[in-house]
A protein has these predicted regions:
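Ubiquitin-like/PB1-type beta-grasp interaction modules and other compact soluble beta-rich domains
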Residues: 2-11, 16-136
Length: 136
């Protein structure tokens, strides 16, 4: 009986350890880690996120998606609402901003310039640097 209980306990311990050892894709609960590489695909770009306190996280996104928005949505890094102008991004890397509530919004940048297109209408350019910055 004691040997059987020891065996069962050992099996449970092994299963718990296997569950804890699962590979991390760099995104946990919609938050990409600084320096992480997330996704899979032939194209890659750098993503910078600057929060309302000035904190900056930079990570690499690999994708086969056609648009930056699709690539980030697929990884769970952004979320928002569809509008007649496209995707209104409210959450980036786990932080939600809503202009109607807090007077702040996520501004989208392409290679350091304020974007003239929305994230869901911006094609993925291999090697580009895209950014979301919290702004008033």
């Amino acid at each position: 009986m004691k040997k059987m209980m020891t065996g069962v306990l050992a099996l449970v311990l092994v299963l718990v350890m296997v569950g804890c050892g699962q590979e991390d894709n760099g995104v946990v609960n919609g938050v990409a880690k600084d320096g992480a590489t997330i996704g899979e695909g032939a194209k890659s770009f750098t993503m910078e996120v600057v929060d309302k306190d000035g904190g900056k996280v930079t990570f690499t996104v690999k994708t086969d998606a056609d648009t930056v928005g699709k690539a980030l949505l697929d990884q769970g890094v952004i979320a928002g609402e569809d509008s007649s102008y496209g995707l209104y991004v409210k959450t980036v890397n786990g932080t939600t901003l809503d202009y109607d509530t807090d007077g702040m919004y996520w501004a989208f940048y392409i290679n350091g310039e304020y974007a003239q297109t929305g994230v869901d209408a911006t094609g993925v350019e291999d090697g580009a640097v895209y950014a979301f910055r919290a702004e008033k």
